[in-house]
């Protein structure tokens, strides 16, 4: 019997957060972030911190006997960056190397349908 979990990976330019829930999304199984594994604030979003956070999560998943993962990658989105941060790819790679079967990878970044105005004013950011 294969047990499935959903890995929500939120990767911004400042941090990488990994949260694993059950398939309904109601129960949190494990969570970790780049800030929990490194000391410097500037290293929270690094691929190394994301890899260590994914290793912490994978240990908790083995205790719960979860074998399959659905991965949902999210960037800040909205009026902010729509590109995931540097830790997203290394977190996915670390989870696959830990021996979990990845069923699918989804991109769930929120896209505005002409929502709020971008910051910077009428004439944009002047460099």
From Swiss-Prot:
Keyword RNA-binding set for record = yes
Record InterPro entries = Ribosomal_uS11, Ribosomal_uS11_archaeal, Ribosomal_uS11_CS, Ribosomal_uS11_sf
**What keywords are assigned to this protein?**
Ribonucleoprotein, Ribosomal protein, RNA-binding, rRNA-binding
What superkingdom does the record give? Archaea
What PROSITE patterns does its record include?
RIBOSOMAL_S11
Gene Ontology MF: a single term: structural constituent of ribosome
**What Pfam families does the record tag this protein with?**
Ribosomal_S11
Q: Which Gene3D superfamilies match?
A: Ribosomal protein S11 (3.30.420.80)
What is one term from the GO cellular component aspect held by the record? Answer: ribosome
GO biological process terms held by the UniProt record:
translation
NCBIfam families to which the protein is assigned, alphabetical:
arch_S11P (TIGR03628), PRK09607.1 (NF007176)
Function in brief:
Located on the platform of the 30S subunit.
Q: Which family does it belong to?
A: Belongs to the universal ribosomal protein uS11 family.
Quaternary structure, per UniProt, is: Part of the 30S ribosomal subunit.
What name does this protein carry? Small ribosomal subunit protein uS11
- Origin organism of this chain? Picrophilus torridus (strain ATCC 700027 / DSM 9790 / JCM 10055 / NBRC 100828 / KAW 2/3)
Gene, per the UniProt record: rps11
